[in-house]
From Swiss-Prot:
Subcellular location: Nucleus
GO molecular function: histone binding
Top-rank lineage group of the source organism: Eukaryota
Organism: Xenopus laevis
Biased composition (Basic and acidic residues): 9-42, 101-111
Protein name: Prothymosin alpha-A
UniProt key word Nucleus: yes
Family: Belongs to the pro/parathymosin family.
InterPro entries named among the record's database cross-references: Pro/parathymosin (IPR004931)
GO annotation terms (biological process): negative regulation of apoptotic process; positive regulation of transcription by RNA polymerase II
Main localization, broad class: nucleus
Region feature (Disordered): 1-111
UniProt GO cellular component terms: nucleus
Amino acid sequence: MSDTAVDASVEKTTKDLKAKEKEVVEEAENGKDKPTNGKAENEENGEPEVDNEGDEEDEVDEEDEEDEVEGEDDDDDDEVEGVTGKRAAEDDEDDDDDDVEIKKQKTDEDD
């Protein structure tokens, strides 16, 4: 009987997740932040929208700054890879210690 209860809760959770996923997809397609009537958010609140061209320039500057920050992150990745490469080289040295020493075979000429 407990199996049935578990199955029902799993089905419910699965349905909830599918419904939530559908909502998220619809919001992404429709643009959740966009007003449904096409007006700016300030106009909906009764405040007139002010057209500031300076704001647009600020937005461009912010995007440039974000690109620069992303570029800095790439440098960090290179440093991490470099450190990893050094560790790999150190590991190779340790492998030499584990190698079995090769002994020469005696031949008739050695006697």
